[in-house]
Amino acid sequence: MPKLKTKSSAAKRFKKTGKGGFKHRCANRAHINTKMTTKRKRHLRGMNQVAKVDTTSLVQQMPYA
């Protein structure tokens, strides 16, 4: 049986956590941020957890994560 390939786009966007979940970067911070308040930019700075519903599809996309 051949090796399973990892989807490189998913590997760049998501990281696995210790308990088996996934985390990702917050959206809406790429450009045109001058109209955003400092508070909004600060809250978008960290990482977010991926919903449990989407975790199964990420496991299939990244079998060795």
UniProtKB/Swiss-Prot annotation:
Entry's Gene Ontology BP terms: translation
Cellular component per GO, a single term: cytosolic large ribosomal subunit
The keyword Ribosomal protein is annotated on this UniProt entry: yes
Pfam families, A to Z: Ribosomal_L35p (PF01632)
InterPro entries: Ribosomal_bL35, Ribosomal_bL35-like, Ribosomal_bL35_CS, Ribosomal_bL35_sf
Record-stated family: Belongs to the bacterial ribosomal protein bL35 family.
Protein name: Large ribosomal subunit protein bL35
Organism, scientific name: Francisella tularensis subsp. holarctica (strain FTNF002-00 / FTA)
